[in-house]
Curated annotation (Swiss-Prot):
Keyword terms, alphabetized: Disulfide bond, Protease inhibitor, Repeat, Secreted, Serine protease inhibitor, Signal
InterPro entries: Kunitz_BPTI, Kunitz_BPTI_sf, Prtase_inh_Kunz-CS, TFPI/VKTCI-like
Name under which the protein is recorded: BPTI/Kunitz domain-containing protein 3
Signal sequence residues: 1-16
Organism field: Margaritifera margaritifera (Freshwater pearl mussel)
Membrane spanning residue stretches: none
Tissue expr: Nacreous layer of shell (at protein level).
SUPFAM superfamilies according to UniProt: BPTI-like
Subcellular location as annotated: Secreted
GO cellular component labels: extracellular space
The keyword Disulfide bond belongs to this UniProt entry's keyword annotation: yes
């Protein structure tokens, strides 16, 4: 696959699977410092909100930037912040899929690395990488279709 991409007003020819995280390492293309950063809403702390009188609380999801995962919490119905999603899929699409790939850490006892898929926000593709089996973040999937349907721009939940 060949793509012509413009970055900082410079055309870049992309052949096959292009890994921008490796290509930009150590480069001084000034406009790209925030490249791969999570949106501000994903970095906000959990705020469960305030009670709405006699209405029962509901279960929602927030992105935990420390663990790198979407986690469930009890929302009381009023207030809070934008790190508050009705379902895990919206949380993943808004935050989890925007994390850079993370191969994890070696397990104890050690195990062989396995092939997983991660969503690359630059190319908008699901690519393979080696995962050690322990740790990492939520931007890793066992199957390509899980990656694409959760994170890809071709499908909305």
């Amino acid at each position: 696959m060949i793509r012509l991409v413009t970055l900082a007003a410079l055309p870049v020819l992309v052949l096959c699977q292009f890994d921008p995280s490796k290509w930009f390492m150590g480069s001084n293309l000034g406009g790209l410092q925030g490249f791969g950063a999570l949106p501000a809403r994903c970095l906000k702390y959990l705020e469960p909100g305030l009670s709405r009188g006699n209405r029962p609380p509901s279960h929602r999801f927030f992105f935990n930037s420390t663990s790198g995962n979407c986690e469930q919490f009890v929302y009381y119905g009023r207030g809070g912040n934008r790190n508050n999603f009705r379902d895990v899929f919206k949380c993943m699409k808004s935050c989890g899929c925007k994390q850079q790939r993370n191969g994890g850490v070696p397990c104890n006892p050690p195990s062989q690395p396995v092939i997983r898929y991660y969503y690359d926000t630059f190319t908008k593709l699901c690519n393979t990488f080696q995962h050690t089996g322990c740790g990492g973040n939520s931007n890793h999937f066992k199957e390509w279709n899980d990656c694409f349907f959760t994170c890809g721009s071709g499908f909305e939940w």
